[in-house]
């Protein structure tokens, strides 16, 4: 720490650095999936029987696969080759021995002669995957935007050219410090290597020798590679902390709610003074509201004088989700066209909602005539009215801060949909029933990036939000299988063996990432309370 006053450096994300190196913009996921649906419908022809809402879920999966391919600089043409050609491929020189073995393992379990109906459907789609991939990138680039992985790959391919490198590097600061990274994809790694070669990059990793130097420990999988490839500005003696004596307590509860109640006694204990050096960490973000409900109110023993929450939270668990659902149901299912009035059962749901008293009741019961554009404008208007009501609160509590952020995210998504509907090149001229289902799916999939004031009081965080942060005392809740790591599964249309063979993200990598999060979280702590549920009807330990 400098004894003299210094100017604070500028802070940015890795994504910000890539964006400085390109004139292209980053396409929103909603726009990308809708464009992909249009291309899919053209390519598959009569075989494309899915409506947009039916396509959307696995369209997101397909887009995530394309994103992963580009971020790992994989050869998409070879990956999406005809399965017969892939099986007969003799030149495997671009694969490591482990990747070559994974590819051979795939064909041991994929019988081309006796393929099932599901395999035939997979083969039918697979034959068009490269065309979908390349046409999406072409269509987006013509509009001056790309999905993130394609944009990052475009930057790396250009900066590798000697003629463009110097001009591109001039757009970046003279010195760049990379701090706290763990898992790197190939585009990030390539950019770091280019900056290191130009003597403009400095690397500060966050690790412990306990798991990093043990080859069998999955938590150090990526750190071992990073240190070997890029080096470190700090010597290893800075990173021997886990071996120091810590006070670790394991607490078993019979059901989930008891974990939230345990937090109350933890707050009341002498070992948990209310400072920003102490944190409650949730392995399951859906438990945030039960936790907040269990914390003592002002004036009660154990009530923290200051408290801050920083974590992702599912929008479907907030009142704005049920509010929008009630409005959409009213307009799409609740209107009797013969009687020219809304059905009581559907209207009653809206009238009972806590947000109903915040809106213009007369406007809320105007029928939108089955028009999608009018429906979205109707929803946006009412969401704005609710948001305006919350804006009058001078010092919102944690609940109110969370709900304000949920309202903002909902308004943002509705605005995006409206703008897409007004465009001619996006296939959102759909039946209202399709739009209704799409709205529900989109809202249910939103995770609210809830950020409070980290410099104040006790911290409540999800596991991801604790990265690069250290706490003296911690209470970790929901430390159970399926919650840490959180429901890790392969959400991909690319088979696992092929993902391994072409160097894409695999389940093994995801597990290693969460193992690192856990060890890094506790490596400098003095006291840690770990709480798990042992009930037979709950998550297994």
How should each PLM-predicted stretch be described?
Residues 1-13, 18-28, 168-171, 192-193, ...:
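Anion-coordinating catalytic cores for phosphoryl-, nucleotidyl-, and glycosidic chemistry
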Residues 132-153, 174-177, 242-254, 502-506:
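Acidic/glycine-enriched edge-of-secondary-structure segments
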Residues 147, 152, 157-160, 170-198, ...:
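N-terminal start-of-domain structural block
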Residues 160, 164, 197, 268-272:
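Residue-level signal for alpha-helix termini/capping positions
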Residues 169, 176-230:
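Extended, H/D-rich, highly charged conserved domains that either
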């Amino acid at each position: 720490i400098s004894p003299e006053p210094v100017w604070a450096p500028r802070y940015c994300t890795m994504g910000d650095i890539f964006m400085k190196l390109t004139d292209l913009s980053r396409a929103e996921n909603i726009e990308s999936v809708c464009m992909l649906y249009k291309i899919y419908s053209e390519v598959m022809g009569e075989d494309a029987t899915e409506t947009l809402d039916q396509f959307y879920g696995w369209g997101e999966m397909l887009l995530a696969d394309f994103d992963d391919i580009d971020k790992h600089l994989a050869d998409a043409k070879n990956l999406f080759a005809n399965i017969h050609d892939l099986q007969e491929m003799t030149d495997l020189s671009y694969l490591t021995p482990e990747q070559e073995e994974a590819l051979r393992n795939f064909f041991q379990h994929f019988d081309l002669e006796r393929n099932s109906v599901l395999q035939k459907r997979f083969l039918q789609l697979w034959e068009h995957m490269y065309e979908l991939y390349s046409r999406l990138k072409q269509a987006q680039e013509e509009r001056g935007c790309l999905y993130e992985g394609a944009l990052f790959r475009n930057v790396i391919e250009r900066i590798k050219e000697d003629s463009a490198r110097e001009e591109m590097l001039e757009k970046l600061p003279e010195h760049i410090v990379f701090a706290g990274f763990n898992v790197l994809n190939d585009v990030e790694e390539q950019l770091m290597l280019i900056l290191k070669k130009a003597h403009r990059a400095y690397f500060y990793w966050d690790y412990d020798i306990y798991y990093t130097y043990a080859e069998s420990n999955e938590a150090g999988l990526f750190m071992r590679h990073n240190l070997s490839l890029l080096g470190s500005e700090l010597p290893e003696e800075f990173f021997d902390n886990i071996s120091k004596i810590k006070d670790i307590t394991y607490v078993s509860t019979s059901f989930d709610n008891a974990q939230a109640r345990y937090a109350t006694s933890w707050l009341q204990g002498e070992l948990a003074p209310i400072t920003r050096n102490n944190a409650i960490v949730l392995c399951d973000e859906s438990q945030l509201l039960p936790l907040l409900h269990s914390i003592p109110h002002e004036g009660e023993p154990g009530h923290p004088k200051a408290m801050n929450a920083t974590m992702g939270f599912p929008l479907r668990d907030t009142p704005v989700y049920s509010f929008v659902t009630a409005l959409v149901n009213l307009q799409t299912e609740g209107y009797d066209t013969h009687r020219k009035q809304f059905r009581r059962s559907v209207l009653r749901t809206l009238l009972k909602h806590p947000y109903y008293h915040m809106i213009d009741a007369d406007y809320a019961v105007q029928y939108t005539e089955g028009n999608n554009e009018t429906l979205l404008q109707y929803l946006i208007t009412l969401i704005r009215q609710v948001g305006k009501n919350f804006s009058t609160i001078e010092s919102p509590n944690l609940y109110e801060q969370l709900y304000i952020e949920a309202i903002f995210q909902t308004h943002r998504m509705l605005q995006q949909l409206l703008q897409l509907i007004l465009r001619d090149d996006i296939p959102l001229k759909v039946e209202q029933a399709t739009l209704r289902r799409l709205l529900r799916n989109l809202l249910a999939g939103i995770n609210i990036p809830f950020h409070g004031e980290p410099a104040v009081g006790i911290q409540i965080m999800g596991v991801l939000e604790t990265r690069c942060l250290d706490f003296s005392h911690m209470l970790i809740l929901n430390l159970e299988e399926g919650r840490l790591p959180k429901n890790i599964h392969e959400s991909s249309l690319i088979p696992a063996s092929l993902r391994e063979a072409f160097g894409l993200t695999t389940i093994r990598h995801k597990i290693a990432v969460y193992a690192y999060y856990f060890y890094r979280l506790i490596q400098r702590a003095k006291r840690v309370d770990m709480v798990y549920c042992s009930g037979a009807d709950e998550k297994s330990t």
